[in-house]
Design a protein with these regions (language model features):
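Basic amphipathic alpha-helical segments that dock to polyanions
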Residues: 67-77
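Short, Lys/Arg-enriched N-terminal segment that forms or immediately precedes the first helix
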Residues: 10-24
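DNA-recognition alpha helix
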Residues: 46-60
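Non-DNA-binding regulatory cores of transcription-related proteins
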Residues: 76-162
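Pre-recognition alpha-helix immediately N-terminal to the DNA-recognition helix
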Residues: 32-37
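Short helix-capping/hinge SLiMs at alpha-helix to coil transitions
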Residues: 23-25, 39-42, 57-58
């Protein structure tokens, strides 16, 4: 969510607070700060990158262990996702959504600029993957799918904007 307007950021953070409250949890100031940094980032961030950004914007240093605990909390609350391939984090693109999403999360990762798009897979696509696994005797468990490629912006840059 790069170049996010302050009003949109505030709205998403309010939605995150409501979501936490519905789950009997609190979005504390530090949790809010970590989530805000992830929402404003144009690419996935490691825990130490989050720590660095948080410590730049405050006078009291946040310990690294706190960032790890906060990221774990935010992941449990379904507000952020950890990308398995890079061990980095992105904010959930569906924080303010009021509709259902499939259990498995799907990400399109750009190899050029490191941008990440969270996408909804169709039920048909999920069923096709389950059927493919079933033919070789594997029962799939819900998990996220990470696919790498080149985004439109990078494709246009590589071809000289043509």
């Amino acid at each position: 969510m790069p170049n996010i307007k302050q009003s949109k950021l505030d709205s998403l953070l309010r939605a995150a607070e409501v979501s936490c409250a519905e789950n009997g949890a609190r979005l504390t100031q530090r949790r809010r700060q970590v989530l805000s940094e992830l929402m404003q980032s144009s690419s996935p961030l490691s825990a130490y990158e989050v720590l660095d950004l948080c410590n730049r914007s405050t006078t009291s240093a946040m310990p690294a262990m706190s960032v790890y605990r906060i990221l774990d909390f935010l992941e449990q609350q379904l507000l952020v996702h950890r990308l398995s391939t890079s061990n980095k984090y992105v904010s959930c693109a569906h924080i303010a959504c009021d509709h259902k999403h499939f259990q498995a999360t799907h990400f399109l990762l750009c190899e050029g600029c490191s941008s990440v798009e969270e996408v909804d897979a169709t039920e048909e696509a999920s069923e096709a993957l389950e059927q493919m696994a079933k033919t070789v005797g594997v029962k799939l468990t819900p998990q996220q799918v990470e696919l790498s490629g080149i985004c439109t912006t990078c494709q246009n840059s590589a071809s000289g904007g043509v």
